Structure formats: structure tokens, C-alpha cells
Amino acid sequence: MKHVNKILAGLITCCVILLLSGCSPRQGEKHDFSIGKGTFLLDGKPFVIKAAEIHYTRIPAEYWQHRIQMCKALGMNTICIYAFWNIHEQKPGEFDFKGQNDIAAFCRLAQKEGMYIMLRPGPYVCSEWEMGGLPWWLLKKEDIKLRTNDPYFLERTKLFMNEIGKQLADLQVTRGGNIIMVQVENEYGAYATDKAYIANIRDAVKAAGFTDVPLFQCDWSSTFQLNGLDDLVWTINFGTGANIDAQFKKLKEARPDAPLMCSEFWSGWFDHWGRKHETRDAGVMVSGIKDMLDRHISFSLYMAHGGTTFGHWGGANSPAYSAMCSSYDYDAPISEAGWATPKYYKLRELLTQYADSGQVIPDVPAAYPLIEIPAFTVGEVAPLFDNLPAPQASKEIKPMEQFDQGWGTILYRTTLPAVKEGTTLLIDEVHDWAQVFADGKLLGRLDRRRGENTVVLPALAAGTRLDILVEAMGRVNFDVAIHDRKGITDKVELISDTGRQELEDWQVYSFPVDYAFVQDKKYAAGDKLDGPAYYRTTFELDEVGDVFLDMQTWGKGMVWVNGKAMGRFWEIGPQQTLFMPGCWLKKGKNEIIILDLLGPEKAVVEGRKEPILDMLRAEAPATHREEGQTLNLKGEKPVANGALKPGNGWQEVKFGQTVKGRYFCLEALDAQDGKDNAAMAEFYLLDEDGKPLPRQHWNISYADSESTQWGNFTADKIYDLQESTYWSTKQGDKYPPQVVIDLKEEQTISGFRYLPLVLSLHNMNSGVIAYWRSSP
């Protein structure tokens, strides 16, 4: 009987193991993942992908396992990741897949925790990451055309893809790993139409060894067919609040038997310096996921956990230029520090009801311990101008890349001729934030976000030293503006009533972001300077834990702790703290170095247990309407007046004849469903040949109504190249709302293109009137 009991116990144990593992990947076991009629198939059985997007680059390697466990406890069965080219190949031909960059180790950890992997190797990844994941050194080739069949770009892409294949191809499920799908490029329809290029990237992915699992391409519902290849799976990206049926309508018409997947379901949104902290409603997010699960639609939650964009790796959007904060909290279910939020528990409750057969959702892992650090003074300082590196000489102005510098700050120095008072110094262009000095005296600051590029000079004697210190704040990560060279990109001129004079004969000093560089300075006692300087001190800890460094009294710059680049700070907010993982601290002495380009109010740092992500000190108003301001259209003759079609996708309105002017006004008469708020995703004006006009210099000069209650739904979103961000009027404001666009110069237009917003929460415009004139 005892022998029988042992056998029964063994059988029960085996059954429990099988039950717990369900359809999870176990190391060494080979599986088949394929496409069936209307569904994905895992070993021949229908499988709904419930993926959590997290990024190994935004999580300390020591915390990878915890974050993966958090995703599993959320109810997910898959982890979705990008591969970041520029983190792995920071110098041409030098690949780094070790330590924090060990992407294969990350995937194996996911497999150990019973999670599949969706791999997105780019080469372009967007992700609010520096240059969309492309390496800066590509821009050293002056005529390069990124994300095209440019021979050099394709050559370097194939080399990188082969290295990714060496790391990950053997981790496909057919070979005992956990990779079930691999993506080709990323949202390319928002960039261009070029199927030949997409085919080349597909071939590069295959040549790298990814031949066993389905390859897919993601795009927006309005653009997915522009570059869709017949042999790739098509997936759609959209976010919280989307109308699920409308998003998939065109895909179902094009491929009625294909499995459906939202490859990026945006749980929140990212933060920009100088703009309000972004949040999205948890209930609306969960409702959207439920709608998909009820229809057996697979999804990947972007982001399940955003983490932190450590160091200098944050990207930017354009137009208008706007750099990303270091926090990538994203208002995701798992917070920046790895905590389970109310949004997490709400989603977990739903996913528990849709668990896979045999799936047991584990308990939520405990968060890492928190500590506080009492305020301490950063008591050593090294003025930047007293710690200049060796210069490079250049006859003419060149961007940072031509001096073999990828990131950081760059100083351009020359001597001036005699300058009359009132002369204008024109810097074309400032990328991204500059300070101008004459013999060490600050004359002005220029911010690319505001389009600033001139300083009016006082009278200056011949031989006066001119210094232009330029900080690179992050390369644009979206659309054609990714060709974003840093420093001063063209030239510097003096403009006066006697003419224009281009300045030449520059001494150029590079200030990179490497820890070895910032450590090797002549530090001396002192705790406050007016102007750019490095600050250093040490602080003692009796215990270690996660903490948020409070940078509220500092100006603008970067922080390093124990050699780790923590990220950027800027007094304008909304982010005022930097997440400091406890795994990078140590008991006893810890070192902190701070580069502050403005100078601190107080050279003091303390560690808090809670982040500050929503303290905005920006000078710019949140909306585009001054107190009491109104728009008078009486007597104006419209250039267009009519109704827009309902439904998803771009619509085009042609005028009876071309018109010339600078200011364009769009007035929304009503909404498709008769409710009181209007919305628009994207808007283009068409030139006399019917082609879209460039929008990088556009500005909203007036907006009658803008919603900022639970997001930045301001009017400038109609030309930010993002279908997922949009202008929405404030709930309850009366019709008709109006938006006035300033093109900055007179243009001839023949019509406009308009992308309606397809959300379940907001309404598209129905009737519109358009006005066009040369003066405000």
C-alpha cells in the first residue's frame, strides 16, 4: 500500500507540474508556433497572445526577473521586447551583449518564468528612445537616408541583424527557446511607403536565422496596407479608448481569415519636458482589453512596465521639437519602480477571468524595499569653463557628429569682430539647448522647443571671445526628423544694418557623458556657481534600497551615482525626481556627480520614497487661448464648407481653387454622434500640386477649446505625426470650436487631409468650415 501511495503521490506531482506549466515554455522543449484560420496556433492549438511589453534597457539587470514575474502575476503569457541597436553598437563594429545589454539572458529569464517572447529587432524601434534605436554614428555620413534602401544604411542594418541572430535565433520555440514571433521594421507606414525596403529588412531578419517562427509587421489602422507584404502577419497598434471594431475593420476586410492582434495597446503615454504629466484611465484600458479578449484578439500591452530611460538615452518628438523625460513610468500598470498600481490590480482581475487552460496566475511579487536619504550638500565643484578638454579646430561650423561626439554637450568658441549694439547673432540651427557667452558673461539662452535661434548683442569690442555651449537633449525618435544632428547644424551669423557676416575659425570642445570623463575634473570645495559646472560629493548609507533622488533645487543637467548614469533633470518639470535602484547603491560610501548647466538654487540632494512626476514649472501656457481671448470670423469668407465622411482612415478635401495665405482656421460645426466634444488626430494642408506641406514650423495661434483634464489633448497634436495623440475639445464646451494654425509664412494651398479619431470615448467632426487669410 505504501508503494501504491508513492506512485499516486508521484502521479499527483506530475499532474500538478503539468497543470502549473500549462502551455508555458520550458527550457529545452521544442514547440511549433504558426498561423491558423483566424487564430495563432501553439502546437496546433488556438493560442491568444497576452503580451506585456517591457524593455531590458530600462530595467536594471538585477531587477529583470522581478519585472518578468510581475508580468506573469498580471496574467500575461508573453513578454514583448525591442532590441536596441544603438545600445549594442555604440561604436561601429563594436558589439556589446554583456551585463545590462545581455538580451539573450533576459529572454532565458523569461523562459525560466514560463513566458514566451515576441522579439522586435528593428532596426528602428521608436520607443521614445534616442534616434529610435538607430546609432548616432550613422549621421556621420552626411548624405545618409535612414530607413531606406540607402546602401550604407542597409549594410550596417544587416550587420546588426546578424549579431542579433547570433544571440537569439537559437531561442526560437522550434529550437527549445521561447521566441514565438519576430517583427520586421516598426510602424513604417507612419514614415514612408516603400515595400522594397520592407522586403529587404524582412530578408535581413531571415538571413539572421529567424526562419522558424512567423514574422510580422505592425502599423496603424490607417497605414498598415501601405507597406504590407503578403508573407508577413499584419498587426495593428492603437491605445486606450480605441474603438476595437473600427481599428480592425480594414484588416478584416483585407484578410478575413487572419488572426487579429493589437501589437501595441498603449496603457498610458510618455512625458515631455515642460508638458503636463500624462495619465490614462484604468477602467478604459481594461475595457479595451476585455473587448479584445471577448473577440479572441491577441494583444501586447505597451507598456506593462515602462521603467526608466537611464542616462542620455531619451528621445524626442518633432514637430515641434520636444524632448522626453527620463522617467518612462508611462502610467503603466507596473510603476517606474516596479510597484503594482491600482491599474495593475484592475487588469489582473480581468486577466484572471481569461486565464489560459492550465494557467495558474501566481501571487504578486513583493516590491523591493525603499529607503530615505537625509538631505546632503554636494560640496565640491568643477566649473565647466575651467575644465576644458583639448579642442578641435574647424574653419566652419559643423554638427557634433563631425567631431566624433555622439552625446552630451559641445562648446563652440571663436573671437568676434567689433560688434555694434543691436546686432543679431543668428545660430542656425540650435540642437537643442544653448547658452551664449561673451568673455564669460551670459548673453542669452536658446531653446529649440520654442524655435529660438537669435540673441541681440550689446556693443562688443573686436577680439571678444564668443562661446556657444550647446546641450544635445535627445535625438528625435519618430518620422523623418530622426536625421537629427546635434550641436549647431549649419552656421552662425552676425546680422546688422550693414549686412550679414558668417563667423568662422572655431575651437570646438566636446563634453561627452562618459563617467570617466565627468569624474576626471579639478573639483574643489564649493557648493554653488552661477553657470555650468560639475558637482561631486559622497554620502553614507547604513542600508540600501530603492529611492528617488529629489532634484527640485537644481537647474538642468545629468546625474551619475557610483558610475551609473541616472538620467536628466530640468527644473521646468514635470519630473522632479530620479529613480535610483537600490541594486546600484552600496552600504557605506557612495559617490554622486551632477552636471548642472544652469546652476542650482541649492546644491542639496535628498532621497525620497515617492516620485515627483507631475510638478510642472513650465513658462509656456497649457492651452492656446489667453484669458478672455475670442476669435471673430464675422465677414470672413470660407474656402471650404461641408461634411466629412464617418469612419476610419484619411480623408481629403479639395478647394474649388488654390488660395494663398499664412493663417488657416478650421471650425468644427458638430460631431458624428451629436455629442458636445470634437476631436482630430492629424491634419495636413496640401500645396498647389496636392502634396502635403511640411509642418515642422507650424504653430497654433488660437484654439477655442482644449481638453487637459486627463491628458494633453491640445490643438498642436494635430500636426505631431502621432495618430494616437489628438486634439479634443473640453467636455461641455459649446460648438463650434475653432483652431487657427500659423504656417509662419505665406503658402499656396489647394485643400487639406484630415485623419479622424476613432475612439469609443471621443467623437469625430461631421460638419466643418475652413478659413484662410494672410494676417492674424
Put a short name on every predicted segment.
Residues 23-78, 108:
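N-terminal carbohydrate-binding accessory modules
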Residues 92-99, 112, 123-148, 198-202, ...:
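Aromatic- and acidic-residue-enriched segments that line the glycan-binding/catalytic groove
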